[in-house]
Amino acid sequence: SKIYIDKTNALNQIKVLQKIFNNIVGNSRLPMLVIDSKNDNLNRNNFNASAAAVSGFSMFANEVVYLLDKDGNIDYVNLNNFLNKHSKSKFLVFGFTYNIFLNLINQLKINKLSQKNFSKAFLIHGGGWKKIEKQKIKRGTFNELLNKKLNIKNVINYYGLVEQIGSIFFECKCGYFIASNFSEIIIRDENFKECKDGESGIIQLISLLPTSYPGHNILTEDVGEIVKNHNCTCYGYGKRFLIHGRLKDAELRGCSNI
């Protein structure tokens, strides 16, 4: 199947993403380290979810450097040049969750780094949890491993559809995903009736933004719950919600293998 996004819709999606993102990281463009291979993302014949996500978030960058070489190995020359230039001020690290787990947590050799402190980094990641959960790695453990190895404190997960970058939901420091003014979330039970707050069910995503394709109202195969009683004072006043995974027997696919 194909999703057609015209110029007007694409611009609206970008404007909204920028507004949401700026509330979290700030208004300035920042250098960005992408945990992926440049070759994979420039190949338009194989333009997948990873390439689309990198393309969308690259607009917040004033420089983009890729961690992996054409063979998928860590390019320490590129990485050290990037760290020597940018590690003393705020910078972005972006990638799919599994790529970050595989390359930064598992394979990166600290003794090959010229600068070992990533404390100024804002690490943005999303998708790919299915592969990690098989290894019993949860959000808290994932963040702790990044902090312990690279001193990364600002780890921000996101949830959404790759074709609707303006309807993205970022995870706050309290561990909740937050709906923006341009999107909404409803939780439904197995009979598609609306769940009460705190009850787990099927996630329904609603967005104001799609104009060139029918993406306003989508019933996903993801499971989550809306959190009513919380003390979260993070950015935005939208609904707080949690993601619990996929429906039982749902097709095991996601951004890590699209």
Model regions: which residues?
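Active-site glycine/GP-rich loop and adjacent strand/helix microenvironment
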Residues: 29-33, 44-48, 52-258
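Short, glycine/charge-rich beta-strand/loop segments that flank catalytic centers
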Residues: 9, 29-40
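Short acidic (Asp/Glu) patches
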Residues: 10-20, 77
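Conserved AMP-binding A3 loop
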Residues: 1-12
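Active-site diphosphate/adenylate-binding microenvironment
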Residues: 3-4, 19-23, 41-43
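Hydrophobic alpha-helical hairpins/lids featuring a short glycine-rich hinge
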Residues: 18, 22-28, 32
